[in-house]
Amino acid sequence: MDEMKRINDAAEKVLAVCGQAEIGIILGSGLGDYAEALEDAVKLPYSEIPGFPRSTVAGHAGMWCCGTLHGKRVVMMQGRFHYYEGYSMKDVTLPVRVMQKIGVKTLIVTNAAGGVNMGYHPGDLMVIGDMFSLTAQNPLIGPNLDEFGPRFPDMSCAFDKELRALAHACAGEQGFALREGVYAQMTGPTYETPAEIRMLRTLGADAVGMSTVPEVIVARHGGMRVLGISCITNMAAGILDQPLNHAEVTETANRVKGHFRALLDAVVEKM
């Protein structure tokens, strides 16, 4: 199917059911409960949106949720799509294109991540200051969609400086501090080996996960302001003498969701 037709068909359905929005929030593993904060919420299963993939990962409900939060029209994704699920980068980033079509100007992207920085601890929240990917894929490969942005978009400041400062200020008002660091994306679905983590640390990564980078690339291509928040749910391989598992990821995300919710509430209110 033609890429623009796919985007337009999905956006038409979303507009008919949910209407326009100004802020988009992608909720990562174990963080989907935050969608319950929406007032006058309408939920649209991904299965009812033309051309949308399906969420297959535990902790990803597969719902497009829209409503009002602090007087602003907000759309939240309960679950995202991952390259390791067998989806293309166009599939993974389709929701961001749909957000752009329905009026979203600011994207808050969240994820569960492993701590690469030895000074981090499970339960920390990290503002993403920069990012890199070792997937050898880019969602903008192929014909440029001129309607959204230029052929060669600038990525020198992928994450909005003002929004990062706002996040730190809001956390301080809530009585806790945020980390700030570099997020690295690997393909998954395997967790990284200790050797890969040593490599990532050498490259400057503070946290690692299996998502986020393609969504941010497409968001910036379309001129969106972006704020990224990683929930450090576990220490990466080789730091602690214990195996990694998805249950630990969702358990830690559940443990810190109070801070997570307070942070997002305050940020959205002050945008």
Regions found by a protein language model. Give the residues of each.
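His/Asp/Glu-rich mid-to-C-terminal helical/loop segments that flank catalytic regions of hydrolases
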Residues: A237-M271
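Zn-dependent metallopeptidase/amidohydrolase metal-coordination segment
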Residues: M210-E248
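Short acidic/polar active-site loop segments enriched in Thr and Asp
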Residues: K105-T106, D206, R225
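Metabolite-binding pocket within alpha/beta catalytic cores that recognizes anionic/polar moieties
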Residues: M1-M155
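Polyanion-binding loop/helix "lid" in catalytic or ligand-binding cores
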Residues: F148-F159, Q185, I197, A253-D265
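Active-site/ligand-binding-proximal alpha/beta "capping" segment
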Residues: R164, A169-D206, L264, M271
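Non-catalytic positions within long, well-ordered alpha-helices that form the structural scaffold/packing
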Residues: Q100-G103, R201, R220
